[in-house]
Amino acid sequence: MHCARYSTGTCRSCQWLEKPYPQQLSDKQQHLEDLLQPHAVQRWLPVQPSAQTAFRNKAKMVVSGSVERPLLGMLHRDGTAVDLCDCPLYPTSFAPVFDVLKVFIARAGLTPYNVARRRGELKYLLLTESTQRGTFMLRFVLRSETKLAQLRAAMPWLQQQLPQLEVISANIQPVHQAIMEGKTEIILSDAAALAEQFNQVPLYIRPQSFFQTNPQVAAALYATARDWVAELKITSMWDLFCGVGGFGLHCASSEMRLTGIEISAEAIACARRSAEQLGLKHVEFQALDSTQFATAKAEIPDLVLVNPPRRGIGSELCSYLSRMAPDYILYSSCNAESMAKDMTELANYRALRVQLFDMFPHTAHYEVLTLLKRA
């Protein structure tokens, strides 16, 4: 992949860009195999590659410059702004949206936030595309509600120019820190969730719910989990840290009892909507802390699926799962180092199969799926 920003040194986010893509994949696989060497993996499956360009469905743009000439992209530590509207990681459908948004910022009078002066209102634009329908979710991250009336008044023009904007919201982030979003989300459009679909499974993305940024690889990850679980002939399953339900909804059958747990109420609302649309009768999604839920339950499911944040599932949940001893644990991780640590604590489980998914090309990061069976 060629990137003019990388060549000039103005953006080095893709740290492995100079490394040939096959070498990227082999280096990631070697890193994973080294980490899991103590765990005697029975079967390694081939790496799931990614497209090398236009694979991201989400843009997180810092807004800088002036209200008349806004810049969308990133800020270096010295305050230098870099416009990333032509970043090759984004699909070609993003650039026309960015062009209109620059005009809209001026029309609505949304003054970009100046980090050095601590003045201005508009901090970030967060844009997510549905690969199913080509529609978008747009979030304006504002310092306060001061410009909210102006934003609402100017929205009809924006919706006329960009009818593909399905969900529009304002997030209020008042803190002078490099934090992407605050707690308050104000829905400005009729729709509150972006419709998506992977492998004939309907999924919904609300503004504050987590969703994978590489749809092609995410679809392969979910399909693989579905296929592995189908081979096991299980009747009950927990999906912990379930997000909008992507894993559980793929794995659930009409007769399986599925319980999905996620701390985000917004994500749970999306998961419930998908389950209802699929007609699943034995599925329950709850907005709870995954560790607290699991350690408070007496029943033992056949399989526990975990998809934790980068820190992993942690000692408390590892200890409880070891005592509870479900037949299988399916572990999806975006940080193989924390997963390897958790696997060490799950000493009474052996790794049946492992597969790497290249969710983040041109970086050292990747996703990994591991099936564990009680020894």
Swiss-Prot record:
InterPro entries: 23SrRNA_MeTrfase_RlmC, MeTrfase_TrmA_AS, MeTrfase_TrmA_CS, SAM-dependent_MTases_sf, U5_MeTrfase_fam. It is an enzyme of class 2 (transferase). Its EC number is 2.1.1.189. The active site is at C334 (nucleophile). S-adenosyl-L-methionine binds at Q212, F241, E262, N307. GO terms for molecular function: 4 iron, 4 sulfur cluster binding; iron ion binding; rRNA (uridine-C5-)-methyltransferase activity. [4Fe-4S] cluster binds at C3, C11, C14, C87. It catalyses: uridine(747) in 23S rRNA + S-adenosyl-L-methionine = 5-methyluridine(747) in 23S rRNA + S-adenosyl-L-homocysteine + H(+). One of its GO terms (biological process) is rRNA base methylation. The keyword Manganese does not apply. The keyword Lipoprotein does not apply. Belongs to the class I-like SAM-binding methyltransferase superfamily. RNA M5U methyltransferase family. RlmC subfamily. Catalyzes the formation of 5-methyl-uridine at position 747 (m5U747) in 23S rRNA. This is 23S rRNA (uracil(747)-C(5))-methyltransferase RlmC. It comes from Pectobacterium atrosepticum (strain SCRI 1043 / ATCC BAA-672). The gene is rlmC.
